[in-house]
Every structure is written in C-alpha cells, then in structure tokens.
Amino acid sequence: MPTPVTTARECLTEEAARALDDAVVVARRRSHAQTTSLHAVSALLAMPSSILREVCVSRAARSVPYSSRLQFRALELCVGVSLDRLPSSKSPATEEDPPVSNSLMAAIKRSQANQRRHPESYHLQQIHASNNGGGGCQTTVLKVELKYFILSILDDPIVNRVFGEAGFRSSEIKLDVLHPPVTQLSSRFSRGRCPPLFLCNLPNSDPNREFPFSGSSGFDENSRRIGEVLGRKDKKNPLLIGNCANEALKTFTDSINSGKLGFLQMDISGLSLISIEKEISEILADGSKNEEEIRMKVDDLGRTVEQSGSKSGIVLNLGELKVLTSEANAALEILVSKLSDLLKHESKQLSFIGCVSSNETYTKLIDRFPTIEKDWDLHVLPITASTKPSTQGVYPKSSLMGSFVPFGGFFSSTSNFRVPLSSTVNQTLSRCHLCNEKYLQEVAAVLKAGSSLSLADKCSEKLAPWLRAIETKEDKGITGSSKALDDANTSASQTAALQKKWDNICQSIHHTPAFPKLGFQSVSPQFPVQTEKSVRTPTSYLETPKLLNPPISKPKPMEDLTASVTNRTVSLPLSCVTTDFGLGVIYASKNQESKTTREKPMLVTLNSSLEHTYQKDFKSLREILSRKVAWQTEAVNAISQIICGCKTDSTRRNQASGIWLALLGPDKVGKKKVAMTLSEVFFGGKVNYICVDFGAEHCSLDDKFRGKTVVDYVTGELSRKPHSVVLLENVEKAEFPDQMRLSEAVSTGKIRDLHGRVISMKNVIVVVTSGIAKDNATDHVIKPVKFPEEQVLSARSWKLQIKLGDATKFGVNKRKYELETAQRAVKVQRSYLDLNLPVNETEFSPDHEAEDRDAWFDEFIEKVDGKVTFKPVDFDELAKNIQEKIGSHFERCFGSETHLELDKEVILQILAASWSSLSSGEEEGRTIVDQWMQTVLARSFAEAKQKYGSNPMLGVKLVASSSGLASGVELPAKVDVIW
C-alpha cells in the first residue's frame, strides 16, 4: 500500500525532504497516481546544485571523445521517456499529493539502514521523537540524509536500467556520490579556507621540475598544462574550471606578460596576450551598450590581432566568465555573438582563455549559451589545486600540515641532515647534464613512492616485470625494520645517497671531477647499502641471460660494473641510507653474494651502456617474433623497437600504464600470433594471455560475457592475472561504455571493474588490433583477389570427394566458376542495411554512430605507445602453390591428358588448414599439408585411377560435400571416390 507523503517526509532530513517534494511535484504535473524513484531522479537532475546532477556531469566529462553535455542530455531524455511510459491517473486532479510508492518507500528504509552502518555519519544522525503513530516510520526516527537517499534510489532496478540506456553505470555513479571527484570536493573548502595540503597530495608534475629543485624552474604546472592546450590543432581554447582556476589564469597571464615563456611549445613560444576582462565588465555593467558600439569594440580587437603580426598568435583573456551567466541582457547576447564571429574569422591567430570557479557556473554558462562550447572551440581544463613553487626551501619546517603522514608533526624528529639547495644549485653541480637529469628523476621517483604505498608493496607489486629481480629474505627484513624512520629524515638521507651514487657513476663513466662539497653534516650509517635490488617476479623470457646481462658473481673493474644511465628508474630502497667510505662505487657484500648465489637469482643489472642493452633486447625479441611471424618482417622490426623503447624510455607520457601497442591493417592471424608470442616471452606462457574480440557475435551468447561488457570481462581476468598480455581485437567496434573505460585506461594506466575498484595495468602489455589501416585506409578493394582473408578465416571442414564424369561438362562449369570469381573480386564493399530499423534511423543513425566511433578510434589510437600497420597476406599465391601441388599429384596418377577441376571450397579448406598450422606454432606448417596430399589425396587419386582408368574424355573433379560439414578447419582423413 502506498505511503502518504507526510509520513515519508518525516523520515528525511530537510534537504532530502525538499528533493522528495520536488519529486511529488513532478508526479502531480504528469498526473501519475504514485511518486516513484523515477520521479525523484527527474527532480534531482533538474536541480542545478544537486549532488546527482554534478556527479553525472562529472562522470560524462571523463568521456574524452564525446561531449559531456550530449551524454547528460541523453540521460535526461531516457528519464523523460521512462516517465512517459507510466500510466496516467484517469481520475480528475485533486489537491492531494500522489503518495509514495512501495519501491520508493523501500528505498528510504534501505537508506536508513545504510546510514546506521556508516560510522563516519554517526555525529550527524539526529534521532527525533515522534508522538504520532504513523504507519510509515517507527516512533524513533532516523533522519535520512540526501546522499544516502540518492544511493538507495540508484539501487532501484528501473533506475539502473534507465542509467544504463544513457551510457552510465549506477555502480560508478554511487561510487562518485560516496567519494566525489576532486572538482566536487574542492567546493567544501571554498568558504574562507583552503583544503589541507600534504606532500603526498601535491599534484604530479614533470620529474625534472619536482623536489628538490621545485623552486628553480620558475614555471607553474598549471601554466604548462594551459600551454599544451594552446598548442593543439583543435579544442585549443582553454576554459579553466575549479577553485584555483582564477589563480592559475592570473599566474599564466603574469608569466606571458613578464616574458617567461619557457613552458610553451616551440611553435607558440612567441605568444602574446590581450586582456579584455575589464572591457567585458564595462559593456555588461549597465546593459546600455547597443549593437553598434559592441561591434566597434570587437572590430578594434580584430584590427589589433591583424596588425600584431605575431607568428605564434594572440591569446584573448576573457577573465571570469561568470559575468556571462548574469540576468538576461541584450548586450550580453550581442557580445557573445560578436566574439564568436571574431574567433571564426581569426581562428588561426587568435585563441580565447577564460575561467569559471565551479562546475555549477559552467553548467549555467552552457544552459545560457548551448553552442558556446562548439563556437568557441573550448577545451575544459580542470584546475583542482595551486601549483605555485614553494618558498619554504627544500625542507620546510616540520609541522602537522607539512609532514608526509597525518599527525607526523606531533613527533619530534629533528633531522641531522641539512641540504642547502637553492635555485643556483644546477650551476654548481659537477655532474654532466645527462647524469644530473637521471639523478633528478630518481629523487622524484623516491619521493613519489614514499608518499603512498610501503616499500614492499611499491617494489614488489608496482615494478614492471623486466625491471624485477628476486627479493631475498635479508632485503625484506631490512625493509620491515626501516618503517619506523621519520619520513623527512629518510628523504634527506636518500637524496644524499642518490647524489653520491650519481657522482660515482659520472666520475667513472664520463671522467668528471669530484662533486663539490655542499656542507652536509655527517650522519652515522643506520642501514647497509644495496646498489642492486632483488624482487621476485614471474618467470619471464626477458629475465634469462639471452636478453639481459649475466648476474654479477664477483667484483670487476669499475669501468665494467658502474651502473649507467637507465631511463626507467631503478632507485635505492626507501629505507636505506648510503654510507660512503671513500671506496668509490659500492658493491654488495660477499656474504650477501654467497647467499644469492645459493638461491640462484636472476638479478636485473644495470649495463654500462644503455644502447648495448637496448640492442641486445631488441635483437632477441625480433628473432623470436620473426620465427613465429616470418611473413611480417617490417612489422616485427617495428614491434620490437616499440616494446624495447618503452622499456628504456622515461619520457613516456604515462610510465605506469604498461605498454599499449596498436596493430592495424589486415592479417588477423599474424596479429594474434604476435600477442601470444609476447605472452610467452614476457610472462612465461599462454596462461597469462587474455583475448577478446569486440566484433564477435558470439559474445552475447557466451556464458562468460553474460551480464558483462567486453571490458568488464577483461578487468575480471586482470584482477586474477595482473601480469598478462591482453589482446583486444576489432577495438574500433567497441560500444560506448567500453570506449570510455578504454580511454581512461590508456590515459591513467588503471582500469575499473564492475564494482568501481581500480586495477593497475602497470605490468600489462595491451595489444589492440583493427582492420583499419590509418595510413591508407579505404573501404574499396584496390587489387582484385580470388581468396580474401575473410573467406580464408571463415572456411569450414568439409567432407571431400573425387567425382569422375564427362570432361566437357566439367569444362563448362570451370569456365563459369572462373568468371564468377573474377566478378566477385572487383566488388566494392557495401554499407550494412538493417531491415529491423525504421527508414529514418537506417538513413541517419548508422552514419552518425560510425562517425562517433571513428572520432573515438582516431583519438584513442593516438594515445598508444606505438602503431604498426601489417601488410596483407598474399593468399592467392599460397592458393596457386596448393593448386600446383595437387596438379602434380594428379598428373602422376592420370597423366597430363586427363582434366582436373578443383572446387573453390576445397581450395579454401586446404588453404585455411595450411595457414592455421603455419600460424599455430608449427614451424613447418606447409609440410603438414604436403604430408596430407601424399598420404591421403594421392592415395585417393590412385584408387580412382585403378577403378575407372584414364582417358582424355574422363573428367575428374575434387569437390566439397555439404553433408560432411564439421566445426573448425581440419583436413579429412579420407577422400571418397564416386562416379
């Protein structure tokens, strides 16, 4: 029985009750008999400042290739359509509110129970005594907060289905409601105080600009991000959003005006800036400006841009765009229109930049001007924190807010280590530029690692497989005992250790003078030194001596053993303090050496030459791939270069994202063979090989995909096998939800599972394939072929027969077959026509969907580490060789006068069997077909010759019988002879 609205309202807080009242208004306006969860969702989405609306907009904005505005509109449309399907009440409208449905009341009850189970909201639980004995709530009522009310509504199956139709996942929305993104959280600290900043929460920046030289560059991280947007070909007009957006814009404009342009790209290094924030405020102040006056001011701006002659362009600073969301004003509409015309006319030289302080302001701006994002070519750039360089030096004073961990400042831990570094340190270093770069990278990596996970987790779980070695028990003991050190002491000690390490390396390799003393105070050693780290890792081909240097068994001359420059950071353990006794490069002790020798470890050593290691790995990997995929020589070379380059390149955009490799063009079998070989080389076998096909029709019927998308299945497999090679076939056919998650994965190196949990892809090699070749993509068959790859891969196992008859009839059929084959070869691919769709959808929807997928695929493929285009396999030549071999066996039995006709299905079956055996690991794949011809086919030819003899009028035809169809591609053990 439905519950009265007044009774349900007593169970809610004031904010949640207002949301329920809005839902009741929606139900009454639509003449619905009851107020359901859908009405509540509709009301929450309509509220400008509701949590659900902000979360949905934020979630949609994470979809890179699509407009967040469009996806949010799709959600509103789906909710509206679902409400339209609900039956309307036939009774005349009354003053009573539509009662709360059983499902919505059950959601309120669930939210009460859920709120009781969360201790963090205990201090907010308000227990109110109620004297009325209403049937909806108990005498003691727990007021439900809006957040828990929304979470329970999202559990409703109908709401879940509606969100799914719009491309959202209720589980992800619930996760964002519980833990809002940073852009949402920042609003909590906007009133009079800034969010607390810990060192572990500072935004990541370029390693070369990080601690301990953060104050030396003078460039702001947000300014660098803005410069990257301005250097783009499209979407080059940044719109900064966030609490710190105004500050970031001011820092950027000050840098441009003062001539500090080092953070800009070379092609826009001469950028100039014009600020019109005051002019916009004056125009909109009283609204008295007419169209002519506004047009004259905008024309003056256009002339200024044309007369500047700046090759790098001009940026027009619009300032805070909140002024554009003011009350209706004719001058406002005219100004936006004229600025759009100016940008369209001067698009090559002119760029816009502006900021808004909150997502709510941005939403109001889009509501006011729906096309402004497209007209101004805006690129939304979230600014969640200030990135100004610290003015407190390298080691600020210890305090509660400055410690690495909360409450760390309560413990007295005065460091005995003073590092008087300043902005001029770079000029006083005696290391060469290359060694100094690597030193800075290792310092940045140490600090970044120390601020999140423990050493054991960081080293054992996060290192890529090719940088792992076996972790001895002694190492683990040292690591465990070091966790009680104060973080500031540890960081200072590591910095000094890294300085000495790279001093020794540079002195021994590049013969540079000794590093000048900077006045470090002596520190007594607390832990032994380790210059090589041993970590256990899965069995991998790259860990064998074939690809890496042999382990060090005894000390050798300094020139051979000095660890040289390595692009992928292998730093000292976080818990170790290096002690230099003046012996130069420090080696492991003999005791440790003997123990590791008994355990037979495979140490990952640093070669004295990075190029030597790269060449050795490259040649070994190329040799293995060439044996498996011998017909794709150029592609194999490119793949080996990309993978080995990623192993040794620290300049990659996201080193924590594993390796992403795109294989484009034809040869589906060759691509799959490459992925399988990589799993054998890097992870020890096919057990760590995950393969899915976005274009497969059987995915919806397979039990393992039931209730899941393709990416859901992949995340489940990666959670069980974190060290794997993932093959994603036909990635251009991915559905919209999978596209969003793949874009997030390639950008962040992390992929979300069904429940919103994040799975790291650092130790994963992702191979994405597509039949589209981006260099010469075409939908037409340029060269006519008789045996295209699609037909070979779709071949089936038929029962083969040898038919004998009149040669004249066979000849006629043969000529007809050849004619049809030639005609089919030159046909152009046609668009797919779905007869189940209405005419208007058939004409427009597929084209629009294809354009969206193409746009996403183009942007996604640019983010991978490397692209390799495969060449088509010449199946016609292989078929010709098969025909010649069959003809040779036939002539030995019947002679050259008897005519033989081969059915096309027979050629396809033999061709597919030969190709599958060649690509499934058989080095002598062709010998399998040759043996079958000798033992089976030739014997059947001899049997036919013995039964029916040989004469010129006899015709022989090798055909495929449809009665013997079998799954897979196999050659029959017997060929029947019939007349």
UniProtKB/Swiss-Prot annotation:
A motif (EAR) lies at residues 833-837. PROSITE patterns: CLP_R. GO terms for cellular component: nucleus. Residues 12-86 are annotated as: Repeat 1. Detected in roots, seedlings and axillary branches. Expressed in the primary rosette buds and expanding leaves of adult rosettes, the vasculature of the hypocotyls, cotyledons, and mature roots, and in the midvein and petioles of young leaves. Keywords: Nucleus, Repeat, Transcription, Transcription regulation, Ubl conjugation. CDD domains: RecA-like_ClpB_Hsp104-like (cd19499). It is found in: Nucleus. It comes from the Eukaryota. Residues 100-190 are annotated as: Repeat 2. Residues 8-190 form the Clp R domain. Disruption phenotype: No visible phenotype. Suppresses max2 phenotypes associated with strigolactone-D14-regulated growth. Smxl6 and max2 double mutants have branching and inflorescence heights similar to max2 mutants. GO terms for molecular function: ATP binding; ATP hydrolysis activity. Ubiquitinated upon strigolactone treatment. Probable proteolytic target of SCF(MAX2)-mediated stigolactone signaling. The keyword Repeat applies. One of its GO terms (biological process) is response to strigolactone. Induction: Up-regulated by strigolactone treatment. The keyword Repeat applies. Probable component of a transcriptional corepressor complex involved in branching control. Regulates cotyledon expansion and lateral root growth, but not germination or hypocotyl elongation. Promotes auxin transport and PIN1 accumulation in the stem and represses BRC1/TCP18 expression in axillary buds. Belongs to the ClpA/ClpB family. Contains 1 EAR motif required for the interaction with TPR2. Interacts with TPL/TPR in an EAR-motif dependent manner. Interacts with TPR3. Interacts with MAX2 and TPR2. Interacts with D14. The interaction with D14 occurs in the presence of (2'R) stereoisomers of strigolactones, but not (2'S) stereoisomers. This is Protein SMAX1-LIKE 6. The lineage of its organism: Eukaryota, Viridiplantae, Streptophyta, Embryophyta, Tracheophyta.
